[in-house]
Structure formats: C-alpha cells, structure tokens
Amino acid sequence: MRSHQAGRKLPLLQLLGCVAVFSVFVFTIQSSFFADNNRKLDLQPEDIQILSDFQSSVQQCVANRGLGLSAHIIDHCNLILKFPEGTNSTWYNAQFKVFEALEFKYNVCEAVLLWEQYRNMTTVLTREYLDVRPDGWLDYAAMRIAQLGADKCYNRTLCEEHLNVILPAKPPFHPRQFHKCAVVGNSGDLLKTEFGEEIDSHDAVFRDNEAPVNEKYAKYVGVKRDFRLVVRGAARNMIKILNGSDNEVLIIKSVTHRDFNEMIKRIPNPVYLFQGIVLRRGAKGTGMKSIELALSMCDIVDIYGFTVDPGYTEWTRYFSTPRKGHNPLQGRAYYQLLECLGVIRIHSPMRSERKEDWSSVPSREMISRAHTAALRLQRSQQPTSSKRDGSGQFGNCKVWGDADPTKGPVSGSPDMSETRKKSNYKKWEVMPFRSLRKEARDHYIQMKGVSQYKMDGNKLDDLVCVRHPLKLDT
C-alpha cells in the first residue's frame, strides 16, 4: 500500500517541478520584455525629433549633391543610400561571387559619433600610447613590426630598437592645427579639371602612396606637399617618393620593417606610423585613412580625386594605367554620406558649376545637436554594467594614463646618418605650444591637456586617454 502511494507521489512531484520551471521561464521572458520596454522608454522624444530632423536634412543634402544618389530614411538613425535604377554595377567581388550592390544601409547616429570623435583624436602612434595601453608594448607593438620573429615583444629592448626611429614620445600633431586641408586622391578624373592652384591654397595637403607631384601634373593636382600616407608596398619606395621635398611628412599605414628603418635613417623627412581603428563598413583603402588623418588636424577637409562615375569598369589613376581597385559604388556612397554629415567637402569635375556652394550641407550647429542627441541615445541603451563613470568629452575613455612629466625622447636612433641628424625631421615633435594655431591651443586647454587615441580592435567608442601637464608656456 505504501509502495503504491509512493509511486503516485513521484509523478506529482515531477509535475510540480515542471510547473516551477515553466513559471521561472515565463518570469524570465516577462522580465526581459519589461527591461526592453524600459530601455525604449529611455528614448527622449526631443532627441528622436532632433535626429529625425537631421535625417531629413541629410536626405535633402544627398538629393542636391549626390549626383543621382538618393537617401531613404528607415528611422531616426538608419537610412539607405541608393543608386538610380539602371546603374551598371560592373564591379565583381570574386571572393563572394557577386556584383557590387546598388544600395547601402548606414547608421547615421553611429557615423556622427565616430567622425566627430576623429576631430579630437591623435592618429599617429606614440610612445605614450604604448605605455598606457594595456599590454601595449607586449602585444600591440609586435603587431606593428614586420618580421619580428615573435608574436609578442618578449624582448622590449629589441622592439624599441625597431620602433625608436619613428616613435615620438607624444603627439607631434594636434587637433585644430590647420584651418583648411586638401586630401588628394589618385582618381583619373583629376585630369578633367585644373584644381592645382586651388589645392595649393590649402594650409596643408595630404597625398596617398606614390602619387607624383611634378610639373607635368601641377595644374591638375598642385605641387604643395605636406603629408603623405603610404601602404607597406609604397613605403619600400619612400626615397624615390619623397625626392624633391625634405619636409613632406611620411606616415606609414600598416607596419614598419627593418628595411624601412634603414631608409628612414638616411632621409631628412619626418616619418611616423599611423594609429587608427579599422573600419568595418564604409569605403576601404588609403584614401579613407587619409581623411581620418586630416580630420584629426584640420577644421575643414576638402577631397579631390575621389569621385567615381557610377558603373565605370576600371579603377583609373591620373598618373598610370587603370588597375583593379575596391568597391567603387560603396566608396562613392560612403563619401557622399560623409559630405552630408559635414565631415568632408567633395570636389569633382561633375560639380564645377557648384563650386563653394555648401548651403545644402547641414550646419555645424545642427550637426552638434545631432551629435549630442546621438550620444544620449547611445548611452541610454547601454546596459548598466557597461556604462562608465563620467560624461562629456571624456565619457568614452576606457583606459586612462599619465604622460611622463619629462619631455621624453624624440624619434630617432644613434646610428642615423648625418643627413638626418642635421635635418629638421623632428620639428613637429619639438614645436613650442605657443607656436600652435590659436584654435589648437584653445582646444588643448578645453581638453585639459588630454590626448585621445582609438583602441584598435575594440568598440568604436573605446578610447585610450593620456593626461599631460598643462604647461602652456612650453
């Protein structure tokens, strides 16, 4: 009898257990639902309205300046840029075996936050960055040295020997250092319009890779040479590329190499390594990195030689035969988005009649309001556990550190040639604070002497922030 009763109790206990598990499951779903609802309730109507108005302004800008592109708004943050029907997409992606798409989706809120952030960034690799970044010398430094012979800098002295010749102690360049800058691409359409004098009128000119500067192309691309961003392959020809200018700053996009160092020790030009995040969307290539570099130093960035006609079949260059490039339609769409976000100004033969007419681009005031609203929106949607203390200009600082109070070593090595030792290659590193443009000095004070760097390989808003003493007389 007792055995029979025990047998009846067992299914009953199992049933009660199932009910309990189901109740917990339902409670979890409800909690998640209400948590999501509460997160949505964090969205402020005024912020949504500001961002919606900004989207409408961007849409109108694309309609006026997009040369056939159109913007289709999804919500207050997302839109799609579409090429017109009938656009001949001839760019074939052999890896995925598809032709390039004719429409691209972008999150404008994220784009505004990212590109406004570059206006406060340091985009040159420095010793202070490696000192402050967690495992900066052990891990990251090794990633920037080709053929090191190890995956990490177990021997820091050896790694320093590789980097010293191009590693300044602190940022050699500063936000707001120049007012108006030109970034000159390599597109063949540069030969359609004589932009040379206009390009040379800028405070600083940025060029890419091996693009020549000579009398043959002077009326098209100018002759002014201030900065040049090069990929690893072009860096192998740096002596030839830099010939004719002792002051042009060479910035290597990827890694250094012992062969590069031997060449650097023989030339009078400043040479540094680029430091910046790898974009997962948007246009790819050196041109985009040149824009990042320019934006970290300049108020206004004008770009030339980046325009591509929808449907073209070859990646043309103004100084050589066509060659294979990458994602022209995606690049064209993304550059247009950047112009309508106030990041760049596009110059091309197709726009010669619209010269200096930027009235359809959202104003700095509207962009600033959209940036503030996007920042509040971003932080309201972050899980409580991931939110950091602080807000404002330092709210995205993930890692903090202090710069060495001493001035620190300038880039270089004892075995440099007499040509380099007697040159002015370190002029940017030793430039007195009082010699900076007033806007750059004011920005430095506003930032309380803090340098901000991107944390490569992490989230877009994770920064390494380094404090400097506010010694304004140095």
UniProtKB/Swiss-Prot annotation:
Chief localisation class: Golgi
Enzyme kind, highest EC tier: transferase
Record bears the keyword Glycosyltransferase: yes
Tissue: Highly expressed in inflorescences and siliques and at lower levels in roots, leaves and stems.
Entry keyword set: Glycoprotein, Glycosyltransferase, Golgi apparatus, Membrane, Signal-anchor, Transferase, Transmembrane, Transmembrane helix
Residue spans crossing the bilayer: 15-35
Lumenal side: 36-474
BP GO terms, sorted: pollen germination; pollen tube growth; protein glycosylation
Superkingdom of this protein's organism: Eukaryota
Ranges of the Cytoplasmic topological domain: 1-14
Subcellular location field: Golgi apparatus membrane
Membrane topology of the entry: Single-pass type II membrane protein
Function: Required for normal pollen grain germination and pollen tube growth. May not be required for pollen development and female gametophytic function.
Protein name: Sialyltransferase-like protein 1
Organism phylogeny: Eukaryota, Viridiplantae, Streptophyta, Embryophyta, Tracheophyta
